[in-house]
Amino acid sequence: MAFVTRQFMRSVSSSSTASASAKKIIVKHVTVIGGGLMGAGIAQVAAATGHTVVLVDQTEDILAKSKKGIEESLRKVAKKKFAENLKAGDEFVEKTLSTIATSTDAASVVHSTDLVVEAIVENLKVKNELFKRLDKFAAEHTIFASNTSSLQITSIANATTRQDRFAGLHFFNPVPVMKLVEVIKTPMTSQKTFESLVDFSKALGKHPVSCKDTPGFIVNRLLVPYLMEAIRLYERGDASKEDIDTAMKLGAGYPMGPFELLDYVGLDTTKFIVDGWHEMDAENPLHQPSPSLNKLVAENKFGKKTGEGFYKYK
């Protein structure tokens, strides 16, 4: 009898899970975990397009800073969008801000959300612990998505019981400006989950592209080796960083040279990605560490955000 009961419960659980993954979700309520530039940007565009948002981080001070940054960003948007109607611009800002709540307790706010977007530190253990905890409190239909730029989505999803409702949703900084979103589908991600995230991305006014769960996805898989090759060109003394930047802007039509872009993105971010790829595939020459990059990061010279990287900033 006990065996029959167990089999029945497994059948019910399996059927319930299949039902949840088979349904296409229209995302209305979004929980964003992480109040940094990326998380705040995602919260802003979601709220500005009619979604209710809860922004989560560890302290009220961080959240207050995030909310202030969102307000400043929204006012810039309103100034352009409502240049001839300042009152409408103010109303847009206030209405958008009113749909963004904040919390320091993620578990308490995911019970009724349609989508959780994680944008925290690029650390697999930390992400796994977060999603494992949220998995216990989130509604059955809730989709989980990670904004990771360097970790495998499958490795993060494995911490949960909803691999079919787990995918990557990779935005680009600054989120309110950059139009692209990479939607990452793992072997376990259901088609309905994928379609729900594509629709959500479009609702944000973004252009979604699809990619399998491969290291770096599309943009970083092509961009990071290009940046690293520019560094190696400079390290060999083949050309100065200034001339390399000028060549790529005037010769290839790029808006920024590789060293300008490295400093803008953050040298610590690039090093983290390269180190992760090197660990996975040490023999690949494209993933070899750079002495110059390592030295600058060790000296806490991360680029524009610290005032110095490959270039110095006032």
Curated annotation (Swiss-Prot):
Expressed in liver, kidney, pancreas, heart and skeletal muscle. Gene3D superfamilies: N-(1-d-carboxylethyl)-l-norvaline Dehydrogenase, domain 2 (1.10.1040.10), NAD(P)-binding Rossmann-like Domain (3.40.50.720). It is found in: Mitochondrion matrix. CoA binds at residues 73, 80, 149. PROSITE patterns: 3HCDH (PS00067). Its EC number is 1.1.1.35. Mitochondrial fatty acid beta-oxidation enzyme that catalyzes the third step of the beta-oxidation cycle for medium and short-chain 3-hydroxy fatty acyl-CoAs (C4 to C10). Plays a role in the control of insulin secretion by inhibiting the activation of glutamate dehydrogenase 1 (GLUD1), an enzyme that has an important role in regulating amino acid-induced insulin secretion. Plays a role in the maintenance of normal spermatogenesis through the reduction of fatty acid accumulation in the testes. This is Hydroxyacyl-coenzyme A dehydrogenase, mitochondrial. It comes from Homo sapiens (Human). The gene is HADH.
